[in-house]
């Protein structure tokens, strides 16, 4: 009987200990809101992914330091998709299945984000894309939002700016025929520029990974364009700009938010260059922007590009929705997000019926400041 009693006591003790363990886990889980993050932290656009993750982390740190959201702490679980759609899917599945995230910020590029939108919609996971500008990203359904403006708007901005601010009458375009981002920008630049009375005198293309653009640039040079539109990411644009200037093409070059970071990857060849962006970091007087930029510089030792600001805004969009709805449930938050009407680092923001943000774009000019390049505010273009 004593042996039975001892065994009984031991079993009860074990059950009690296990129960306490699970109670602790449950309490910890209940006090924490997991936010999944999918970013290209390595690969060709790693600088963008790292900046975006930094912005997300900084916002979460600020919110947690202020007491969290409705008494809950936010936790980022970040995954690297290397800029690969296939790896984006793997990262998404890991975050949802293993980490039990029902809110995800990501991915960064349009191709990687498009690979996971249908999964998120089917599984009722709230997906907030910080920088995927491809127009059909949110077509997957009402669980998919984005914080950035879309390619049609960016392309239109480039066309209007070239006509109205630069006074261009004709333009040449050199774009990546294998990249949806580049194609979308080119197509919408063309529409806006031609509808505004301009003429496209050259439309040349290349393939992803190409390094030599001299053949296309030779054709462009013969047309003597007033402006050259380069809708691609900073690494490729830096290569094109160097070859373009070497050929004696001195026309202004214009691009989009994929240029962000170009000043660290190019030289004087990108002077007389202009690009659309989500905010002006260096010379803004907006209190939210100034505070964000100063905090980022203090934390990371560098000036934040727009992808950091977009990641930062994603977290505050979610925070505001959580507070207003008094919920962290994805189904509730998606409804609350549609009611957004607030001021953020990248501008005053509401969502349209496709869950795309309605907000202005700024055009930045690359200038020489002493011995370094810097982007400065040039113009604002409203929706």
Task: State the predicted function of each range.
Residues 88, 147-170, 183-185, 212-214, ...:
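Hydrophobic alpha-helical segments within soluble ligand-binding/sensing domains
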Residues 241-312, 366-367, 373-382:
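Extracellular/periplasmic periplasmic-binding protein-like sensory domains
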Residues 1-34, 65, 380-383:
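Short, low-complexity disordered leader/linker segments with a strong preference
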Residues 36-55, 79-86, 108-109, 174-183, ...:
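Extracytoplasmic "Venus flytrap"
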Residues 27-29, 47-52, 66-138, 206-213, ...:
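Beta-alpha junction/loop-to-helix N-cap segments that form part of ligand/metal-binding clefts
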Residues 144-205, 227, 318:
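An alpha-beta-alpha
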């Amino acid at each position: 009987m004593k042996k039975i009693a001892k065994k009984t006591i031991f079993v009860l003790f074990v059950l009690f200990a296990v129960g306490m363990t699970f109670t602790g886990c449950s309490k910890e889980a209940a006090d924490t809101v997991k936010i999944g993050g999918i970013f290209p932290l390595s690969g060709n656009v790693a600088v963008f992914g790292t900046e975006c993750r930094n912005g997300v982390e900084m916002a979460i740190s600020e919110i947690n330091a202020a007491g969290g959201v409705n008494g809950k702490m936010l936790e980022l679980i970040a995954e690297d998709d290397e800029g690969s759609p296939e790896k984006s899917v793997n990262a998404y599945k890991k975050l949802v299945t293993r980490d039990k995230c029902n809110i995800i910020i990501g991915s960064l590029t349009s191709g990687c984000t498009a690979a996971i939108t249908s999964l998120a919609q089917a599984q009722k996971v709230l997906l907030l894309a910080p920088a995927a500008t491809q127009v059909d990203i949110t077509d997957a359904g009402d669980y998919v939002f984005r914080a950035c403006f879309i390619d049609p708007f960016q392309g239109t901005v480039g066309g209007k700016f070239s006509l109205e601010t630069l006074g261009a009458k004709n333009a040449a375009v050199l774009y990546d025929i294998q990249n949806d981002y580049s194609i979308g920008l080119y197509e919408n630049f063309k529409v806006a520029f031609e509808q505004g009375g301009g003429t496209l005198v050259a439309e040349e293309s290349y393939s992803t990974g190409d390094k030599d653009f001299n053949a296309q640039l030779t054709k462009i040079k013969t047309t003597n364009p007033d402006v050259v539109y380069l809708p691609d990411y900073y690494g490729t644009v830096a290569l094109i700009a160097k070859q373009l200037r070497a050929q004696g093409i001195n026309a202004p070059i214009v691009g989009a938010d994929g240029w962000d970071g170009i000043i660290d990857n190019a030289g004087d060849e990108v002077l007389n260059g202009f690009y659309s962006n989500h905010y002006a970091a260096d010379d803004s007087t907006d209190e939210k922007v100034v505070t964000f930029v100063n905090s980022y510089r203090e934390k990371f030792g560098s000036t934040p590009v727009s992808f950091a600001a977009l990641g930062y805004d994603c977290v505050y969009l979610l925070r505001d929705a959580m507070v207003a709805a008094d919920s962290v449930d994805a189904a509730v938050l998606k409804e609350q997000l549609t009611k957004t009407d607030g001021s953020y680092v990248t501008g005053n923001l509401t969502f349209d019926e496709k869950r795309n943000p309605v907000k202005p774009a700024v055009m930045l000019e690359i200038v020489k400041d002493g011995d370094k390049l810097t982007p400065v505010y040039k113009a604002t273009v409203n929706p």
